[in-house]
């Protein structure tokens, strides 16, 4: 792990996690989770580990402030056919947010617990991973006998398909100054 080399590493962020209302998200977290499970079934997987923070916040309809100028939460998610395991700095999750997530079948765990939890996966597990987004330590902690299915994260693909409700969030008023700046920088007229 990086801590073995990076000895003066700053503490992990504990910025609050907040939920995103379905009117902005376009779809409930329950529906998104079911869509991911459907994609898992199609791929022949029964476990899906997500490491990409932007996909995690999209899937769970949450946001955070752990990385400057990026509304993500330092976290991992492990989706099974029964539960969703959310690995996060638990101090950053209020009781209200925890209750909302638990209602959707999401179980919270300490951020670092994922490394031990993947070691405990059953030998007959079929784990879907996106190799470009999975860290080496997490991958090396997988039991030897599990089947790994390297595939693009279905949440990333689903996230790219904007729903009608999401388009409404892009229809924000543009000020005269913003139009002028855009006109100057692009040479295009914005109406």
Set out the residue ranges of the language-model regions:
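Active-site neighborhoods and metal-handling regions in enzymes and metal-associated proteins
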Residues: 1-191
